[in-house]
Every structure is written in structure tokens, then in C-alpha cells.
């Protein structure tokens, strides 16, 4: 069996008669074959390898450009968002300050209106008291006048005769008519 294996190995290493073969044993090959193979690989493979590397380089550069554009866009959006945030914070501070000043203004207005209402109530109270005093005074006057009138009538009735009595009544009616015209 060893001979069969050796014969296959020897076939691989030795080319057939009239054909071209490649000796894979590095130590058994000569430098000319190696240089020819390397030269052919470099000559024909250089273009393919160069194209592959150029394509890869272009894809990497495009990816970098796209990433840079995306980064610039993200930075612009971030700056816009920061500007909007600053604007909103300023507006919020203004609303807060305006809210506090509005609260203070409303508080001041409420206090003032309360004082005005209290003053009006005090005036109404004083007017009511004055009105009631005047009414009480008028009632007392009327009662005193009625009592004086009744007393005078009683005195007159006891002292006067019928004719004098009629003249006195006529005079009093005339006085009441004159008083009524003055008060109207």
C-alpha cells in the first residue's frame, strides 16, 4: 500500500509527458517558476485587487461622509432644540413672573375692593341710622303736636262758645292749608 501512495505522490510531483504541470513542493521548485507564478498573479491580480480595494475605500469614504452629514444634521437639530428649550424656559420664567405679579395685582385689587365695600357698608349704616333718627324725631314731633293739639282743643272746647269755636277751627284749617303749601 505504501507503494501505491508513493506512486500517487510521485505523479503529483512529476508532470506527465507532454503536459504542463505545477509542482507544489516548494523546496523542489525552482525560483524561476515561483517568480513566474508570482509575476502572473501580481500582473493579473493587481487590477482586481486594486478595484476591490478602491471600491471598499469608496464605500468607507461614502459611509464616513454620510455619517458626517448625519452628525451635522443631528448637531443642527440639537442646537435648534436647545434654542427652543432656552426660549421655552424664558417664556416659562416670564409666565411665572407674570403669574406672581398678576396674583399680587389681584390681591391688591381684592383688598381695595373689600375696603371700598366696607366703606360703602359703613356709609349705608350711617345713612340708615340717620334716616331712623329722623323718622323717630318726626314721630315724636307728630305725637307731641297731636298731644298739644288735643290739649289745646280740650282747653278751647271748655273755654269757647260755639261761634268762637267755629272761627278758631276755620283759622286752624287755613293755617294747615298754608303749611301744606309750604311743605309741598
Curated annotation (Swiss-Prot):
Localization: Plastid, Chloroplast thylakoid membrane
Keywords: ATP synthesis, CF(0), Chloroplast, Hydrogen ion transport, Ion transport, Membrane, Plastid, Thylakoid, Transmembrane, Transmembrane helix, Transport
Membrane-spanning parts: 27-49
CDD domains: ATP-synt_Fo_b
Record's keyword annotation contains Ligase: no
Topology with respect to the bilayer: Single-pass membrane protein
Cellular component GO terms, alphabetical: chloroplast thylakoid membrane; proton-transporting ATP synthase complex
A single MF term (Gene Ontology): proton-transporting ATP synthase activity, rotational mechanism
Protein's UniProt keywords contain Transferase: no
Purpose of the protein: F(1)F(0) ATP synthase produces ATP from ADP in the presence of a proton or sodium gradient. F-type ATPases consist of two structural domains, F(1) containing the extramembraneous catalytic core and F(0) containing the membrane proton channel, linked together by a central stalk and a peripheral stalk. During catalysis, ATP synthesis in the catalytic domain of F(1) is coupled via a rotary mechanism of the central stalk subunits to proton translocation.
Subunit structure: F-type ATPases have 2 components, F(1) - the catalytic core - and F(0) - the membrane proton channel. F(1) has five subunits: alpha(3), beta(3), gamma(1), delta(1), epsilon(1). F(0) has four main subunits: a(1), b(1), b'(1) and c(10-14). The alpha and beta chains form an alternating ring which encloses part of the gamma chain. F(1) is attached to F(0) by a central stalk formed by the gamma and epsilon chains, while a peripheral stalk is formed by the delta, b and b' chains.
HAMAP family, per database record: ATP_synth_b_bprime
Other information: In plastids the F-type ATPase is also known as CF(1)CF(0).
Family membership: Belongs to the ATPase B chain family.
Name by which UniProt lists this protein: ATP synthase subunit b, chloroplastic
Organism for this UniProt entry: Citrus sinensis
Amino acid at each position: 500500500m505504501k507503494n501505491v501512495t508513493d506512486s500517487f505522490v510521485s505523479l503529483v510531483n512529476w508532470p506527465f509527458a507532454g503536459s504542463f504541470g505545477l509542482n507544489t513542493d516548494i523546496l523542489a521548485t525552482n525560483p524561476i517558476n515561483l517568480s513566474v507564478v508570482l509575476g502572473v498573479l501580481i500582473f493579473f491580480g493587481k487590477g482586481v485587487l486594486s478595484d476591490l480595494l478602491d471600491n471598499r475605500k469608496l464605500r468607507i469614504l461614502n459611509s464616513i461622509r454620510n455619517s458626517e452629514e448625519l452628525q451635522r444634521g443631528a448637531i443642527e437639530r440639537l442646537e435648534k432644540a436647545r434654542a427652543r428649550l432656552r426660549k421655552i424656559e424664558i417664556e416659562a420664567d416670564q409666565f411665572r413672573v407674570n403669574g406672581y405679579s398678576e396674583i399680587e395685582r389681584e390681591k391688591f385689587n381684592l383688598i381695595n375692593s373689600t375696603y371700598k365695600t366696607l366703606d360703602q357698608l359703613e356709609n349705608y349704616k350711617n345713612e340708615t341710622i340717620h334716616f331712623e333718627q329722623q323718622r323717630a324725631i318726626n314721630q315724636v314731633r307728630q305725637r307731641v303736636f297731636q298731644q298739644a293739639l288735643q290739649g289745646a282743643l280740650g282747653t278751647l272746647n271748655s273755654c269757647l262758645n260755639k261761634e268762637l269755636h267755629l272761627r278758631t277751627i276755620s283759622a286752624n284749617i287755613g293755617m294747615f292749608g298754608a303749611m301744606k303749601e309750604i311743605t309741598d
